[in-house]
């Protein structure tokens, strides 16, 4: 072994290819290539183009620090993208692909532009950007002027990674490609995301979200008038959707009520009706992550078959669903966790961003005719050759009649004759999931001599509705026992040291870490990231808990006060003895900084060794989108805490 995957290397040497889109003729793939700029302390991204015929790659953009969201025009002659090349603004640009030429700016906004979609005739592009009715002209704040007093009358007045919103909401706009003339199409009181054109260009189907994305419906926008019609119940959800070839139907994934599950539905425009197609979909269509990753939209193969990207048991797969027969077939799966989904007009080639235990930040191409999948980039091959990733194995644990999937990462130079410290990594959610992905936290720990075990206890996503619902009103119950059973199975192995066990998790994983150290003294060290520590205070301060908490915890605080207390780590923190590091972003609106502050005080007064690392400006998603220096600092603290306390 010649090198380690240190925090610095994982942050500053990793190059990530993302958001790949294949040209309509299937001959080229455009993607955004990103990396961390140490001096500027920010991520940068430029557009690159891969030629399938010759295998050559070339850089397309050079101006600006972040060029993203590349989207092909229907005829393949242009690529639209979003750029920060105009200081203080977000610009929508188009770049010619078949002849040399400069990118041309179509329009700009002070707020971020996103969710581009070309009209079928290639003359117009739909997009979204935030609109503040109190600042319709998007005027910058005056220098030296005191911040305005913030007054709100709505519950969803803030959102993680966006901050204070009040009445600011994302709206749908269109811009004429030839003239650059733009038009604000919607003025809705709620956010509209990811508009998709109907085949005849008369409608845009978008996701309209309420309560910061907890509930969502389809919004049908009449392009001529801007009139918006909402489809489905207010308390339902929509994750992905796609127009049928005739423009008469829309397939969508989601649910008609808050159940923690996802099914497939078919909406008919002519009858304005919804038909349920499945009752417990065994896989989870890739709906992205709010404000961070877009959904992987399905594609109709013909009048009845739909191809989509979904996750099953932590593994990416391509699935074909027949809307007439309700037959579901997995066409392809690999031991990876991919992001995005782009297909050519012939429906042969699928391009995705790729991550696995052995690679990260690459673009993968799947040939539906041959069944072959291959990486077309090798951005991080030299890094992983010098600093090999962890070895791994998958195993299962049976507990109380339920099978729990689990994985174990081992140092690349693993020696079965040695004894290693063990760290249990708990995912977020609670309906998140672990899977076949390259995880910087896990890989950094394994590279520094730790066994890392992680699992999908009951409540995890990607196993269907019933499995996900097992955690409702039972946080810290059966899910905790599942995790302890998985850890027990690993600690029975001769190379795992039961006297050197640690636990770490972020978000719901932070909840479980805080919960565990109040239930047992088996852990000799803990790292608790962005915890949910006290359910009652979380309910009134989180951007989503006032609605989401009712489903998860059994009601409002006054309706379920005993349950809130029984499932709060704060109730048991006085019993904790585990040395604990708490890490949290100070601008976290999902699990607010007050949760970490309460935990710090409770552990300090319990006599624990405790340290609190706070990241100014850090949102809940800071480990993904935060400044490189903060992400590197976090990884150093994670590895350092366990090294100091587990040896």
Sequence positions of predicted segments:
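A flexible loop/linker signature enriched in serine peptidases of the S9 family
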Residues: 33-46, 61-67, 80-93, 102, ...
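Short loop/turn segments that connect beta-strands within beta-propeller blades
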Residues: 51-55, 96-100, 176-180, 222-226, ...
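Residue-level detector of Asp-centered blade-edge/turn motifs that repeat once per structural unit
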Residues: 24-25, 74-75, 120-121, 199-200, ...
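Non-catalytic accessory segments flanking enzyme active sites
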Residues: 19-21, 126-128, 135, 149-152, ...
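Cap/lid segment of the alpha/beta-hydrolase catalytic domain
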Residues: 377-499, 504-506, 538-547
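Active-site-proximal cap/loop segments of hydrolase catalytic domains
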Residues: 457-647
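Surface-exposed loop and turn segments in beta-propeller and other repeat-based domains
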Residues: 183, 275-294, 379-390
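Hydrophobic beta-strand positions that form the internal "hydrophobic ladder"
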Residues: 29, 76-79, 125-126, 201-204, ...
